[in-house]
Regions:
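Conserved class I S-adenosyl-L-methionine
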Residues: 2-14, 35-37
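Short, well-ordered alpha-helices that flank and scaffold nucleotide-derived cofactor binding pockets
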Residues: 22-26, 51, 130
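Extended basic-aromatic, gly/pro-enriched interface segments that bind polyanionic ligands
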Residues: 32-108, 112-115, 120-123, 146-147
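Core SAM-dependent methyltransferase catalytic element
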Residues: 106, 149-168
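A short glycine-rich, Lys/Arg-flanked "PGG" loop and its adjoining helix->strand segment in the class I
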Residues: 122-134
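Conserved beta-strand signature within the Rossmann-like core of class I S-adenosyl-L-methionine
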Residues: 134-142
Length: 168
């Protein structure tokens, strides 16, 4: 069995980790498995994600094939099923402290760094570096950049993401 360990930096109310999990379930062939750690500083947001229930108004961009496979339509919304919920662990975490996670393959931290000053950003980025395994990836938001920061990450040019790779 091959295992992909994926770190999700910001859970919010779970939409992003569930979306990533659905895509991975769709594209990863057997024998690959994965586990997502979805973290946030808001306990209220984490509770929404753990429940896995979303009103129809929040389901907008999910492809029909994913809704049919990973959700059950209920009165007023959709409930994530165990196939997808079992891939995600929701955890309270403040990015200003070390998570203790190591050898992650991917970290998604979109639209969070913009809320920190440069010193705090660098501190968070260094913690991400320590959490990632060799040749692992860091995705950040389009409005964010590591440009001009003294980091060891290598920018990978793509048309679709702000992507960095950990190089040793």
């Amino acid at each position: 069995m091959r295992y992909l360990q994926k770190g999700q930096s910001v859970a919010r109310t779970g939409e992003e980790p569930y979306s990533i999990a659905m895509m991975l379930k769709d594209i990863l062939p057997a024998p690959y498995t994965f586990k997502i750690t979805a973290s946030d500083i808001s306990l209220k947001s984490l509770m929404v994600g753990q429940k896995g229930f979303y009103p129809e108004s929040r389901i907008g961009g999910i492809p029909e094939k994913y809704l049919e496979r990973f959700f059950t339509k209920t009165n007023g919304g959709y409930q994530a099923n165990s196939e997808i919920m079992d891939t995600i662990h929701f955890d309270y975490h403040n990015l200003m402290h070390d998570s203790g996670l190591r050898n992650l393959d991917i970290i998604f931290c979109r639209n969070v760094l913009i809320y920190f000053d440069e010193a705090a950003q660098l501190s968070v980025i260094n913690r991400f570096w320590n959490s990632l395994g060799p040749k692992a990836y860091l995705f950040i938001g389009h409005s964010e950049s590591l440009f001009g920061m003294n980091t060891k990450f290598e920018f990978l040019k793509t048309d679709w993401a702000c992507l960095y790779q950990k190089n040793l």
